[in-house]
Curated annotation (Swiss-Prot):
Signal peptide bounds: 1-22
Name under which the protein is recorded: Complement C3
Organism, as annotated: Cavia porcellus
InterPro entries in the cross-refs: A-macroglobulin_rcpt-bd, A-macroglobulin_rcpt-bd_sf, A2M/Complement_sys, A2M_N_BRD, Alpha-macroglob_thiol-ester_cl, Alpha-macroglobulin_TED, Anaphylatoxin/fibulin, Anaphylatoxin_comp_syst
GO molecular function, one term: endopeptidase inhibitor activity
Site (Cleavage): R753, S754, R964, E965, V992, A993, R1308, S1309, R1325, S1326
GO CC field: extracellular space
Length: 1666
């Protein structure tokens, strides 16, 4: 906690002294910032008085003092030592609502007939708002639950009106609500549904009290597409810094734990890098693969790798930069991956830093000086147990847990500044590397140079509530004055408020007085102690002597709040973990009457984002930031002590008072040093290392068989052990090319059909876990039970959700007496020793094959489990699970291990679809099931297409004040079929003042500050930009942005230009490029113009300026008013649009007139008839204006006339008509002239106060992005900034935005209406419709707005991009007969994988993630050979540590970008399964995890793709069995019964005309000869229809052209749109050959033919029975 970080508890000890009677003094003390709607204490004192003294305190408005805002009375008596307090409260009123200026009040205290008055600053902050969201991260389409806690400045609940907005990551508010917390006990529960189509990134909830709109409180949350991880990764360096001299390098520990507490086994990829500001340098050589065993791994960044990776590679060049380390951990099963990062590890020469932030800046000579040093690690965290010592005085101390050490030194009796140097004395670090820092303390200044001092001290740095400390008052005074000081007065101030006032007596001769002070929770988070005494000193004048000290109090809640499990007898839950769905008891302990907001959050949420949790320390940080005290104590004199402590003091003695406080913020607060190092996501890459082997090994490996059948020469390219090894390898390889080494493996895989004789739970008895919320328990509970030991307890029974995880139960309470409290999170771990973790991606694309993995965990200590696992059928997916056939496998899981079971799916339906996997253990009656939803999205790419953008300005663009717009429907010709589109209609107001602020950013003007030089013309070219830039920055108050110190530099340059220009002044006061050249009218007028503007900035001699004015009038103005040019300038480019010969007399006369008008105020007294001569020029311009044609001339002359108030009537109309599109005065192909002319026109419009015409002109000027530069830019630069500065000054804060907008959508019966108002001008209002339709808009009212219409839809992509930056080919061939296979293997195949990286250099450290087909396992001997031969093709391989090797991960050191990298190995089938599920191969680069490619493989399906039928863009699964094979004999009744089953849609007699056979599916074109039962397709007899079947059903169907068939099927088998519907022949289709007429003569067909005739007759006549 830092001294000035928040409303600290200001404990002010005011020491005051009773004096001999005779010189009464009255004083008033208030906080120097008073807060609206808050009770504030005012301290009143009287000295040397008798009798009772009535006091009235009133608070008035400032400066008028018309209203009494608060008034209180009290009486000071001898019984209270003439010390008293009153409580005042300033109500919120309209005076305090305006945005302009600081808010002040007058506090008056009338002590009898003596009146004191003090002006005090008012803060509109009347309390705090704390916002808690249920989570820190959300997916699109989910709901944000949030609570707003409304509290006053004492953190107690308050009922007030608040405004809440929700802002996009771009800072645009899209929702704004006005809400009241009255009758809500200070807790507002709210929610917001995130749209499906939403911007990803950091969103904000912002809230403020209606009466203090500047005090905005906010909470952030992230929106992204994510899936919760199953484990967390912590990256912990052994030191928080990297010490540059450390030869050991940087050691980092990696900890990986499942969310349910078990340790992770896997592989971590680690890369280090150097961060220098925003730039990151990745250290490629540091890329390492680390095995994570039992949850931990270690990695070291060596000093050499660090130095080799940077340029220049010198240690000192790295100091000041920082290191980061990125870690990605992948489970052995390949099913999940988590990234973590530790950044900001500083590279330092000293491991510590010393700060004096908590040390006062002033000392009292000859009294102890308390030095509080904060020692931090380089990352800013406190460094405990570090010895520190002062230089010179050699005082030693040790830092405490908070990093603070206290050193007390004796100061000399001198009034000179005191230099204090402190350094660390940590063992093992050379002196040169110890941290050292020096501060300078200044002496406290006494009044009248007396020797009266007061010094306060406390024993410790961080104080704990519940203890009592002694506050020491050390007195030093003139010996003959000491006896006058009889007592001290003290007061305690909390969070900017005065809490308590009292007195502490003092006996004569006591140099030290001790005040015992109990530290209560009310003093959290920090407080100040201020003391003062007063006396008539040796100078016979009244003196005040003061001191203060700041103290930190350990953070905790003021009240109590604890959440714990509560099933044991003592209220403690003894169980370490719980089962899913189990009931458990929660106990909440807190203050009676408190309301507790609860939420349970899956810990996985905080793995992804832990940044935005509400904690008690965050609450205190907010409170600290509002502290009105500003230093760690003391002050430069008595007034400085009060002011720095946040107090205002006024006495009845002249001059005895504090100065007026300048602003609400402290000049430089001593910040509370709290910092957490956050983990961020980072991607990285890895390059492998290889250790040398002897040549014999090279030869042996050369003789080994190569699975890829590469030639010896190609294999040798993979040998990286030097020339000698390559030579040996080639020699032996060539000699023994035919050598074969047979490898056998003896491992069995337990995948088989369910054994009926073993005990196992049937699938239908397993109830799947399906409730996996990321947060729940979002309730508010009231603690009503009577208190026991001051604490109330509530017991709740809750049912846990289905997730296997750890839940963090978070609680925030709000109590009327104890305020807000955030409890420590209570963790509840949920798991079982056998379970399924079904890992699903965030979303999948319809019709695109995907692999998911169900990971089965067995946490039993010693038992292997034989498990039957089943994927359940869902018609929304194509998989090996069909309506007719289950997809089960049997796997064995070893103790404390896991097995990943892959499933290949093709999603067929858009939306949220369920995937369900169940598993049962043989002989144990243990089972688990998981049902999760998978989001299926359309093919194609989501596109945001802008349909229309319109400016809304009914007064300007409408007719009769109403603007009508017709918006067309979007062109969605490229939309993916069977997908939705959404049209978003967005409305936003454009407040005019907002446009002004956005005019030109100060940052853009840096190039304008230049040094003028050259001749009389060049000097003015150089002087112009600086003068106009300073003028602009002054007017727009942007110097803070530009750099305050730069203003003086710019003024010096202007002065220089002015002085240089005087060298070119001719004896007649005119100017030319050189003294011997003819005087120039234009240049002289321009000097007048620039000097007139500069006269506000530097000292300009009026005689110089006005002499030039006289010359222009007397020498260059003709009788008719026109000015003539007899000495043209050399640099014609500098004169802008006046340069053109056309209408030059009018434009030159206007230019001179404008210059004279701008000099008028300075020269009116020195130049006779100046006004008359200006008017004469105006007469000339006015007489010529009707004939002028050039827009430039009309603009400059228009401004000249406006200056004389003569731009009106027909002249004004001509001026306005010259504007192109009402926003610019355009000169063809002359951008600079157009900018200059439009600037003159804007100045004219501002003089006319035509604020409606102004905005489009300003907008056009802003859109030009013209910041003044380049050849010929002098006039454009000068005028654009003069005009924009004038605009900033003139455009009043006229809040003219009040517009009603109505949208009439054809699909809606009534219009949607919106009102755009100033107060919420930037609020983005939106309307959305799923219909793609044109609509009409009407707008009426004042001001401007913008309408944007955007269509969001899925557009077809030009071609399918399945792979990103990788090419991948996978082949599967039967192994040759010569290959020996293990005895148990049913068959052996060779899996070939070839891949190439499509980037411009090799992809280092890439990964092949291979799912094996059901029943197959890889040949480990082949894999060993690939990994361990001297010709290494792979870096390493990993398989599940269990009996089912169904996931294989291969690590490659690189994937070439210039040629294919190929590998192949044998895979053996150890048992047969009915349907083999395809396997998959996925390649990805470690540097960029988004770069990936997946291909499938299968022994029968060439590309490993599941069978599906597609019609246009709609696909359906064809993996199910073909239609039912009919029994040989079927009766009439059976036929009728089957045809009348529910769902049968049609019954036809058909004739097959022709067959169209293809590689995927067959189409049969049939004639519908008779409609026996009509269905959804209203087909007539004689029409043709297509019947579609998958190729694999061709043989089973065996249809013949020209033959007749009886066919019926389900409505779900109809496809396409009327009138051209197609029919699927699937498992539910009836296909029966109908014998031809001649075939019916045969005896074997007679009965069938008769039955078919009767069947047809019954169906047609009677239909189906009900």
């Amino acid at each position: 906690m830092g001294p000035a970080a928040g409303p600290s508890l200001l404990l002010l000890l005011l020491a005051s002294v009773s004096l001999a009677l005779g010189d009464p003094m009255y004083s008033i003390i208030t906080p120097n910032i008073l807060r609206l709607e808050n009770e504030e204490t005012v301290v009143l004192e009287a000295h040397e008085v008798q009798g009772d003294i009535p006091v009235t305190v009133t608070v008035h408005d400032f400066p008028a003092k018309k209203n009494v805002l608060s008034s209180e009375k009290t009486v000071l008596t001898s019984a209270t030592g003439y010390l008293g307090t009153v409580t005042i409260k300033i109500p919120a009123s309209k005076e305090f609502k305006s945005d302009k200026g600081r808010k002040l009040v007058v506090v008056q205290a009338a002590f009898g007939g003596t009146q004191l008055e003090k002006v005090v600053l008012v803060s509109l902050q009347s309390g705090y708002l704390f916002i808690q969201t249920d989570k820190t991260i959300y997916t699109p389409g989910s709901t944000v639950l949030y609570r707003i806690f409304t509290v006053d400045s004492d953190l107690l609940p308050v009922g007030r009106t608040i405004i809440v907005t929700i802002e996009t990551p771009d800072g645009i508010p899209i929702k704004r609500d006005t809400l009241s917390s009255n009758n809500q006990h200070g807790i507002l529960p709210l929610s917001w549904n995130i749209p499906e189509l939403v911007n990803m990134g950091q969103w904000k909830i912002q809230a403020f009290y209606e009466n203090s709109p500047k005090q905005v409180f906010s909470a952030e949350f992230e929106v992204k597409e994510y899936v919760l991880p199953s484990f967390e990764v912590l990256v912990e360096p052994t030191e928080k810094f990297y010490y540059i001299d450390d030869p050991k390098g940087l050691e980092v520990n990696i900890i990986a734990r499942f969310l349910y507490g078990k340790n992770v086994d896997g592989t971590a990829f680690v890369i280090f890098g150097v961060q220098d500001g925003d730039q990151r340098i990745s250290l490629a050589q540091s890329l390492t693969r680390v095995v994570i065993e039992d949850g931990s791994g270690e990695v070291v960044l060596s000093r050499q790798v660090l130095l080799d990776g940077v340029q220049p590679s010198r240690p000192e060049a790295l100091v000041g930069k920082s290191l980061y380390v990125s870690v990605t951990v992948i489970l052995h099963s390949g099913s999940d991956m988590v990234e973590a990062e530790r950044s900001g590890i500083p590279i330092v020469t000293s491991p510590y830093q010393i700060h004096f932030t908590k040390t006062p800046k002033y000392f009292k000579p000859a009294m102890p000086f308390e030095i509080m040093v904060l020692v931090t690690n380089p990352d800013g965290s406190p460094a405990p147990h570090v010895p520190v010592v002062t230089q010179g005085s050699n005082v030693q101390s040790l830092t405490q847990a908070d990093g603070v050490a206290r050193l007390s030194i004796n100061t000399p009796n001198t009034r000179q500044p005191l230099s204090v140097t402190v350094q660390t004395k940590k063992g093992g670090i050379p002196d040169a590397r110890q941290a050292i820092n020096t501060m300078q303390a200044l002496p406290y200044t006494t009044m009248y140079n007396s020797n009266n001092y007061l010094h306060l001290s406390m024993p410790r740095t961080e104080l704990k509530p519940g203890e009592t400390i002694n506050v020491n008052f050390h007195l030093r005074s003139d010996p003959n004055q000491e006896a006058k000081i009889r007592y001290y007065t003290y007061l305690i101030m909390n969070k900017g408020k005065l809490l308590k006032v009292g007195r502490q007596p003092r006996e004569p001769g006591q140099a030290l007085v001790v005040l015992p002070m109990p530290i209560t929770k009310e003093l959290i988070p920090s407080f100040r102690l201020v003391a003062y005494y007063t006396l008539i000193g040796a100078s016979a004048q009244r003196e005040v002597v003061a001191d203060s000290v700041w103290a930190d109090v350990r953070d905790s809640c003021v009240g109590t709040l604890v959440v714990k499990g509560g099933s044991g007898k003592d209220g403690q839950d003894k169980r370490q973990q719980h089962l899913p769905r189990q009931q458990m008891t929660l106990r909440i302990e807190g203050n009676q009457g408190a309301r507790v907001g609860l939420v349970a959050v899956d810990k996985g949420v905080f793995v992804l984002n832990k940044k935005h949790k509400l904690t008690q320390s965050k609450i205190w940080d907010v409170v600290e930031k509002a502290d009105i005290g500003c230093t760690p104590g003391s002050g430069k004199d008595y007034a400085g002590v009060f002011t720095d402590a946040g107090l205002s003091f006024k006495s009845s003695k002249a001059g005895l008072q504090t100065a007026q406080r300048e602003g609400l913020d402290c000049p430089k607060p001593a910040a509370r040093r709290r910092r957490s190092v956050q983990l961020m996501e980072r991607r990285m890459d890895k390059a492998g290392k290889y250790k040398s082997k002897e040549l014999r090994r090279c030869c042996e490996d050369g003789m080994r068989e190569n699975p890829m059948q590469f030639s010896c020469q190609r294999r040798a390219r993979y040998v990286s052990l030097g020339e000698a090894c390559v030579k040996a390898f080639l020699d032996c390889c060539t000699y023994m090319a035919q050598l074969r080494q047979q490898h056998r493996r003896e491992q069995n895989l337990g995948l088989a059909r369910s054994d009926m004789d073993e005990d196992i739970i049937p699938e239908e008895d397993i109830i799947s876990r399906s409730q996996f919320p990321e947060s729940w328990l979002w309730t508010i509970e009231e603690l009503k039970e009577p208190e026991r030991n001051g604490i109330s307890t509530k017991t709740m029974n809750i049912f846990l959700k289905d997730s296997i995880t750890t839940w963090e139960i978070l609680a925030v309470s709000l109590s009327d007496k104890k305020g807000i409290c955030v409890a420590d999170p209570f963790e509840v771990t949920v798991m079982q020793d056998f379970f399924i973790d079904l890992r699903l991606p965030y979303s999948v694309v319809r019709n695109e094959q995907v692999e998911i993995r169900a990971v089965l965990y067995n946490y039993r200590e010693a038992q292997s489990l034989k498990v039957r696992v089943e994927l359940l059928h869902n018609p929304a997916f194509c998989s090996l699970a069909t309506a007719k056939k289950r997809h089960t496998q049997t796997v064995t899981i070893g103790p404390k291990s896991s097995v990943a079971v892959p499933y290949v799916l093709v999603p067929l339906k858009i939306g949220l679809q369920e995937v369900e996997v169940k598993a049962a253990v043989y002989n144990y009656f243990i089972s688990d099931g998981v049902k999760k939803t998978l989001k299926v999205v359309p093919e194609g790419m989501r596109v945001n297409k802008t349909v229309a953008i319109r400016t809304l300005n009914p007064e300007q663009l409408g007719q009769g004040g109403v603007q009508r717009e017709e918006i067309p429907a979007a062109d969605l010709s490229d939309q993916v079929p069977d997908t939705d589109s959404e049209t978003k209609i967005l409305l936003q107001g454009t407040p005019v003042a907002q446009m002004a602020e956005d005019a030109v950013d100060a940052e853009r003007l840096k190039h304008l500050i230049i040094t003028p030089s050259g001749c009389g013309e060049q000097n003015m070219i150089g002087m112009t930009p600086t003068v106009i830039a300073v003028h602009y920055l002054d007017q727009t108050e942007q110097w803070e942005k530009f750099g305050l110190e730069k203003r003086q530099e710019a003024l010096n340059l202007i002065n220089r230009g002015y002085t240089q220009q005087l060298a070119f002044k001719q004896p007649n006061w005119a100017y030319a490029a050189f003294k011997n050249r003819a005087s120039s009218t234009w240049l002289t007028a321009y000097v007048v113009k620039v000097f007139s503007l500069a006269a506000n900035l530097i000292g300009i001699d009026s005689e110089v300026l006005c002499g030039a004015v006289k010359w222009l009038i007397l020498e260059k103005q003709k009788p008719d008013g026109v000015f003539q040019e007899d000495g043209p300038v050399i640099h014609q480019e500098m004169i802008g649009g006046v340069r053109t010969a056309q209408e030059a007399d009018v434009s030159l006369t206007a230019f001179v007139l404008i210059a004279l008008q701008e000099a008028k105020d300075i020269c009116r007294a020195q130049v006779n008839n100046l006004e008359a001569n200006i008017n004469k020029a105006g007469d000339y311009i006015e007489s010529r204006y009707a004939d002028v044609r050039r827009p430039y001339t009309l603009a400059i002359a228009g401004y000249a006339l406006a200056l004389l108030e003569r731009l009106n009537g027909a002249t004004l109309q001509k001026f306005l008509n010259a504007a192109t599109e009402k926003n610019r005065w355009e000169e063809a192909r002359q951008k600079l002239y157009s900018v200059e002319a439009t600037s003159y026109a804007l100045l004219a419009l501002l003089l006319l106060k035509d604020f409606d015409a102004v905005p489009p002109v300003v907008r056009w000027l802003n859109e030009q992005r013209y910041y003044g530069r380049g050849y010929g830019s002098t006039q454009a630069t000068f005028m654009v900034f003069q005009a924009l500065a004038q605009y900033q000054t003139d455009v009043p804060d006229h809040k003219d935005l009040n517009m009603e907008v109505a949208l009439q959508l054809p699909s809606r019966s009534s219009p949607s209406k919106f009102r755009l108002v100033w107060e919420a001008g930037s609020l983005l209002r939106s309307e959305a419709t799923k219909q793609n339709e044109g609509f009409k808009l009407t707008a009426k009212g004042k001001g401007q707005g913008t309408l944007s219409v955007v269509a969001v839809y899925y557009a077809k992509t030009k071609r399918k991009v399945v792979c990103k930056n990788f090419d991948l080919r996978v082949t599967l061939k039967p192994a040759p007969d010569t290959v020996k296979k293990p005895q148990e293997a049913k068959s052996t195949m060779i899996l070939g994988i070839c891949t190439r990286y499509l980037g411009d250099q090799d992809a280092t450290m890439s990964i092949l993630d291979i799912s094996m087909m059901t029943g197959f396992i890889p040949d480990t001997d082949d894999l060993k050979l690939l990994a361990t031969g001297v010709d290494r093709y792979i870096s390493k391989y990993e398989m599940n540590k269990d009996f089912s090797k169904n996931t294989l991960i291969i690590y490659l050191d690189k994937v070439s970008h210039s040629e294919e990298e190929c590998l192949s190995f044998k895979i053996h089938q150890f048992f047969n399964v009915g349907l083999i599920q395809p396997g998959s191969v996925k390649v990805y680069s470690y540097y960029n995890l988004d770069e990936t490619c997946t291909q499938f493989y299968h022994p029968e399906k060439e590309d490993g793709m599941l069978n599906k039928l597609c019609h246009k863009d709609l696909c359906r699964c064809a993996e199910e069995n073909c239609f039912i094979q009919l029994p040989e004999k079927i009766t009439l009744d059976e036929r009728l019964e089957k045809a009348c089953e529910p769902g049968v849609d049609y019954v036809y007699k058909t004739k097959l005309l022709k067959m169209e056979l293809s590689d995927d599916f067959d189409e049969y074109i049939m004639t519908i000869e008779q409609v026996i039962k009509s269905g959804s397709d209203e087909v007539q007899a004689g029409k043709e229809r297509r019947f579609i079947s998958h190729i694999k059903c061709r043989d089973a169907l065996h249809l013949k052209e020209g033959k007749h068939y009886l066919m019926w099927g389900l409505s779900s088998d109809l496809w396409g749109e009327r009138p051209n519907m197609s029919y699927i022949i699937g498992k539910d289709t009836w296909v029966e050959a109908w014998p031809e007429a001649e075939e019916c003569q045969d005896e074997e067909n007679q009965q069938q033919c008769q039955d078919l005739g009767t069947f047809t007759e019954n169906m047609v006549v009677f239909g189906c029975p009900n």
